[in-house]
Structure formats: C-alpha cells, structure tokens
C-alpha cells in the first residue's frame, strides 16, 4: 500500500507537494521517510531540509531535568527523549540553539561539549583542544559566505586575562574538518554570567556583556571571525536575551522590587543601525517572580506576535513546614497571566537546580555532520 501511494506523487505538481510538506512538523516528516524511496530522498535532501526549516519554524520548550517538551501554542506536554549519554553526565549546564541543533555543555568533571538534534535523536561529542572550564563561554553558528551547513563552535576562554596578548582568548571548532583552531581576537567586554548561554541568530552569536558601567549586546560573526558591539541594552535583576521572529533580539526584564515585566525588541539585525525599543510591559499585581533567587534557575521564554509572553520558570511554596520547587508554564499578555500550567514539583532539598529552567528551540531535520 505504501508503494502504491508513493506512485501517486507524480500526479501532483512537485512544487505543490513541497509546499504541503513545508507545513508539516519535522517530528511528523521523520515518519514519512519510511513511506517510500521518493519520500525519503526528498525529505533528506539538503535543499528541502533548509527550506522546511525556514518555512515552518514553530518553537518548542525543553526541560532536560524533567525530560519534558511543551508546544507553547497547543500547550501539549510530551516526553523528551534525552540521550543516555546526557543522563550519565547530567546536569546539562547550558544549551545554545542554531537551526534545530543544540550545543550543550555538561557540568561534570570533564565538562564535555556535545551537539544534539532532539528530533533526529542524533548526538555528537566535541573533544576540546584543552580542558573545558565552566567559566568558558560557547556559541554556535556558521559562515554564511561559504556554506550554511558547515557549522562552527566558538569557545571563549573565560579565565584568560584580557590584557595578556601573548595568550589566545578564543578557539573555533569546524564541524566538517573536525578540528579546532586558535583565534586571536580583540575582546574588551565582560559577558554577564547570568546570561552566558547567549543567542544564535542567522548564524551569528549574541551575548549581553558589560563594558565599564554600560550593558551592551556584542556579536560574533563566524564569517569574519570578529566581535562587534551592536547596541546598548536595558538591564535589571532578571534580564533574559532571546530571538524574535527569526531576525531580531528580544529582552525580558523583571525588577527586584517590582514584579512588573518589560519586553524590549530590536529592529532587524541586518539593519545598519540596531537599537532596542520597548515592545510592551505588564504591570498587573498577579505576576509571578520569574527568578526568585540567584541560586535558582533563570527562566526560559519566547515572545509572541500578539504581545504575549510564554515562560517556563521555577517557583517556591511552603506546605506543612516543607519547601517545594514548583515548575510552571505561563502565558502572559498586557493584561496579566492568561494561563498557567504546573508541569512538575520537587522537594526543595531533592531538586538539583539547572542553570537555566528551560530552553527554546526550533525542531529541524538538519543532521549533525
């Protein structure tokens, strides 16, 4: 039956077939690969995989601690199939997303680096050229002047003195050559440790950094292999950097005294001049504290086009003289909390806090080289 259905493909215009497939989630397309050889060849074609990623890019939230994934639109909670290797090396200290690939740092004695595609369930371990430290900063992207699929990793050595020009301060790993190289690049900023996971947008890495008394956005371009200061940014106790609409940066802010939330947005990152402007704020009294204590995990979030926020964060409650950590998924708009879903709870002393509560990624068919 599968083969007879496959023979019907030529009866439809090829362009129409592709347009239909572009609207199907990556998780479902994987099952289509076994239908017949024609489907397999199409779905595994490089051109198709990247077109699908650019046409259909719904976000997912993932928590490796609970092994849970939530679709922020349907609010369906499902199991995340965490590789066995990650379970042995848990906890994952941080993750950075690029084209459906997650660059993961593991907080164990060897501080391993790995690249993981949650949809394809592929994982690749990256052996550092020197010992990886938890104070190092990592990012993932690509040289868009050469080939999008030749992904690269930047490792900025956090403990090297910035005024010592004799020592390299960063390294680049290239997937296709499976090798590291030293890069001597000028770097005059201090990356904020609370936001050190950074954001990869269209192959370039962005971080919140501090220079003297000012907070700013810095960018690393994998094409030119240079750092650049992009724009100043607002900053408060809870400051989380994210991507909006595929080509802009977002900031989620919440102060220490006030529970009010501010959302800031840049214009397109391809513009000559980039700056932040306030998108909207929320001042209703029912807002949760997105980051209760410095020792607890930072929230993971995304911003919707209807001036709404989806955020997965930790809370704390006391019941009968016992303290519990409550994991809750919220949807918030300008009028306050619209929905909240409790997804997990733990005894305070049984819970080993991850550095970030959750991560946002886009499912993709892109294989790991």
Curated annotation (Swiss-Prot):
Any single Pfam family the record assigns to this protein: FBA_1
Entry-linked InterPro entries: F-box-assoc_dom_typ1 (IPR006527), F-box-assoc_interact_dom (IPR017451), F-box-like_dom_sf (IPR036047), F-box_dom (IPR001810), Gal_Oxase/kelch_b-propeller (IPR011043), SCF_F-box_component (IPR050796)
Domain of life: Eukaryota
PROSITE patterns referenced in this protein's UniProt entry, alphabetically: FBOX (PS50181)
Residues annotated as domain F-box: 6-53
Stated name of the protein: F-box protein At3g08750
């Amino acid at each position: 039956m599968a083969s007879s259905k496959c023979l019907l493909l030529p009866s439809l215009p090829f362009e129409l077939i592709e347009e239909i497939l572009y609207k199907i989630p990556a998780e479902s397309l994987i099952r289509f690969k076994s239908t017949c050889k024609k489907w397999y060849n199409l779905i595994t074609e490089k051109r198709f995989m990247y077109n699908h990623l650019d046409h259909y890019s719904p976000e997912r939230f993932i928590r490796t601690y609970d092994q849970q994934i939530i679709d922020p639109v349907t609010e369906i909670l499902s199991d995340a199939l965490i590789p066995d290797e990650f379970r042995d090396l848990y906890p994952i200290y941080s993750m950075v997303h690029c084209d459906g690939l997650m660059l993961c740092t593991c907080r164990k004695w060897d501080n391993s680096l790995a690249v993981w595609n949650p949809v394809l369930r592929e994982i690749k371990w990256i052996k550092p050229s020197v010992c990886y430290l938890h104070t190092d900063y990592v990012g993932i992207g690509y040289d868009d002047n050469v080939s999008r699929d030749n992904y690269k990793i930047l490792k900025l050595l956090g403990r090297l003195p910035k005024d010592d020009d004799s020592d390299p301060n960063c390294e680049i790993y290239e997937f296709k050559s499976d090798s590291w190289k030293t890069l001597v690049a000028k770097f005059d900023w201090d990356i904020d440790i609370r936001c050190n996971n950074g954001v990869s947008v269209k192959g370039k890495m962005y971080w919140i950094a501090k220079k003297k008394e000012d907070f700013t956005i810095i960018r690393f371009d994998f094409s030119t292999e240079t750092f650049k200061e992009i724009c100043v940014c607002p900053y408060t106790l809870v400051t989380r950097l994210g991507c909006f609409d595929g080509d802009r940066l977002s900031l989620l802010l919440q102060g220490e005294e006030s529970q009010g939330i501010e959302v800031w947005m840049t214009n397109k990152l391809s513009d000559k001049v980039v700056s932040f402007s306030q998108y909207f704020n929320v001042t209703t009294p029912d807002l949760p504290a997105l980051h209760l204590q410095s020792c607890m995990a930072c929230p993971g979030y995304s911003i919707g086009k209807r001036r709404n926020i989806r955020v997965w964060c930790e809370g704390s409650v006391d019941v009968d003289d016992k303290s519990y950590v409550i994991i809750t998924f919220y949807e918030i708009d300008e009028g306050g909390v619209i929905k909240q879903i409790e997804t997990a709870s733990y005894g305070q002393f049984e819970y080993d806090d991850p550095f970030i509560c959750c991560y946002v990624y886009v499912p993709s068919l892109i294989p790991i080289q």
